[in-house]
């Protein structure tokens, strides 16, 4: 059985991971769940997955989270220091799904204490990529991208000789222009292009 930590369990990637783990309970043991502000979802996930440690990033919500989990035997903490402490708990797999720069420090710490760092936090590579990769090498931690586009590239290159790859062309999924007629694409403005239906561009 593999021990797992999920950072950002109430976000998009974290929620998908939780769904998968609920169907694989015999293969995985969730040790750590962390969320940002969504205490109801975090409490629900905790009751289903029964992690040892639960962390809410927003320390002001710690009391409310504890109230939702009265009667359950969890180590419940809150705030940045609690997140960083949770990242230092040794696990087989650490999923880093915290959004934005807030996830960088957790990724750097988790790289020291996990066998596999499943990275959805792009900022960790953009802001600290050289350091993160060095920490992974020093600790024999596998760095696996799990965010959509990065994971697709990783999967395509798996088993290939990277030295033979001259360039990678990554096509878009459509964004705001998925159903736009070809003739109408000629008049698209930058403002329209940044109006993605799901993500703030």
Regions found by a protein language model. Name each.
Residues 1-53:
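N-terminal Rossmann-like dinucleotide-binding module
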Residues 2, 50-53, 72-74, 113-116, ...:
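A short helix->loop->beta-strand "cap" motif at the edges of active sites that frequently abuts
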Residues 16-25, 44-45, 125-140, 156-159:
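Active-site-proximal loop->helix
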Residues 55-57, 75-82:
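Short acidic-hydrophobic, aromatic-tinged amphipathic segments that line or gate anion-handling sites
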Residues 65, 101-113, 122-141:
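Rossmann-fold NAD(P)-binding glycine/threonine-rich loop
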Residues 78-110:
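Beta-loop-alpha module in the N-terminal Rossmann-like domain of NAD(P)-dependent dehydrogenases
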Residues 150-201:
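Conserved anion/nucleotide-ligand pocket segment
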């Amino acid at each position: 059985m593999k021990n797992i930590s999920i950072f950002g369990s109430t976000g998009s990637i974290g929620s998908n991971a939780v769904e998968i783990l609920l169907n694989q309970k015999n293969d995985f043991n969730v040790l750590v769940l962390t969320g940002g502000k969504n205490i109801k979802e975090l409490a629900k996930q905790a009751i289903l997955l029964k992690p040892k440690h639960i962390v809410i990033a927003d320390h002001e919500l710690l009391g409310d989270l504890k109230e939702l989990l009265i009667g359950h035997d969890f180590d419940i903490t809150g705030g940045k220091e609690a997140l960083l402490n949770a990242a230092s708990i040794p696990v087989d797999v650490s999923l880093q799904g915290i959004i934005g720069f807030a996830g960088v420090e957790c990724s750097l710490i988790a790289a020291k204490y996990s066998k596999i760092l499943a990275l959805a936090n792009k900022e960790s590579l953009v802001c600290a990529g050289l350091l993160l990769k060095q920490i992974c090498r020093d600790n024999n931690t596998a760095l696996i991208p799990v965010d959509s586009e990065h994971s697709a590239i990783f999967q395509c290159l798996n088993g290939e000789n990277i030295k033979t790859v001259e360039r990678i062309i990554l096509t878009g999924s459509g964004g705001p222009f998925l159903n736009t007629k070809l003739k109408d694409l000629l008049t698209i403005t930058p403002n329209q292009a940044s109006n993605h239906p799901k993500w703030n561009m």
